[in-house]
Amino acid sequence: MLVCDYIVKQIDGDYAHLQRTDAPEEELKVVARALLPAEIYEGCELHYELMQYEMK
């Protein structure tokens, strides 16, 4: 089970580009905004656990 934190690096229309805080060298993860909290903004932190994203 993956548990990690992300930073929203870019919002591009219906998608957000996320960077893992514990592995910044990894490729950015592209996630549909429909799966993310509505109040996200570039630079905010998200917590991922049990296939859900929450604002940190």
Model-identified regions with their sequence ranges:
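Structural detector for short beta-strands of small beta-barrel domains
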Residues: 1-12
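Short, Lys/Arg- and Gly-enriched loop/turn segments at beta-strand edges
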Residues: 50-56
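Beta-strand/loop nucleic-acid-binding surfaces
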Residues: 26-37
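Short nucleic-acid-contacting surface segments enriched for D/E, G, S/T with interspersed K/R
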Residues: 35-47
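Short aromatic-glycine-enriched beta-strand elements
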Residues: 14-18
